[in-house]
Amino acid sequence: MLNKRISNLATILRFIALPRARNIIAPQEYIANSVPVAITRRAARNTFVFSVALTPFVLYSAFHNDSAESDFPELVEVYPGVRPFPAVLGPPELPLQTNYKLLGHGVRAVTFLSFKVYALGIYAAVDDLPLIPRTLSAEYLSTLDTEKVDAPAKEQLYKAMQDHEKSRAVVNDLLGKGLRLVAKITPIRNTDFTHLKDGLVKSILNHPAARHEGETLANGLEELRAAFTRRGSVPKDDDLVLELQATGALQLYHRDAKTGQTTTLGKVTEPLIGRYLFSQYLSGKAPLSKDTKDSVTRKIISMV
């Protein structure tokens, strides 16, 4: 009898040691990347009951580590030839207001030849991550697709993000709730601050709502131009970091890849600038980086 109990305990501890503890209690559920977990309900239920009774602190640690760290590796390869992107950005490496977690990444390409210009990562404030599923509730999503109000939330969100207008509505509503974001722009080849500045200005002007804003947008764009307080070259692998803060302001930073030094550039206080820019990255008919938009879409779908 004692040997049998010891054997049962060993089995329990092996399950607890699994890197994704939540897989034990959620068989056949879609977890993060929608891969079904091949554990029977009965085995999972029995394991969970004994595990909670015997080792609550181990289980808590496993759940905590999974939610905080396991969704992403420490570094993510985005494009050959540029440094991998960190899964988390924040102090002290960068003077951001808080820590930000990678939502998705891709490459920005221009012209009909798909000339690749920079690698891109979109990050969300760690403290704001609960805003995403709370905003994109089943009730909210049902208002976006009145033809299939009973469809699963993930399906409704996927369809909304494939639609030009509905995807803008989703992103605008997230930003309207105060979701803080960061765009990490890493040039694939040598460039300069003027080219980066002109590219951002052009992208904002191409937002479909820009023509209706007139003087407000013009003043914001002047702020953006002035925020580029540095001149000269930006070598390949340097970073231009854009932080969309809680106030709607857009703070700019430049990180030198060779020295590791970060320079705080200027700030744009007009909220339209940051909102239009991130809307252009993540939604609409022709997002600035389709693979980044698709990558972020997959992540937020996994969160609802």
Curated annotation (Swiss-Prot):
Pfam families: Chalcone_2 (PF16035). Keywords: Mitochondrion, Transit peptide. One of its GO terms (molecular function) is intramolecular lyase activity. Residues 1-42 form a transit peptide. It comes from the Eukaryota. One of its GO terms (cellular component) is mitochondrion. Transmembrane segments: none annotated. It is found in: Mitochondrion. InterPro entries: Chalcone_isomerase, Chalcone_isomerase_3-sand, Chalcone_isomerase_sf. Belongs to the AIM18/AIM46 family. This is Altered inheritance of mitochondria protein 18, mitochondrial. It comes from Eremothecium gossypii (strain ATCC 10895 / CBS 109.51 / FGSC 9923 / NRRL Y-1056). The gene is AIM18.
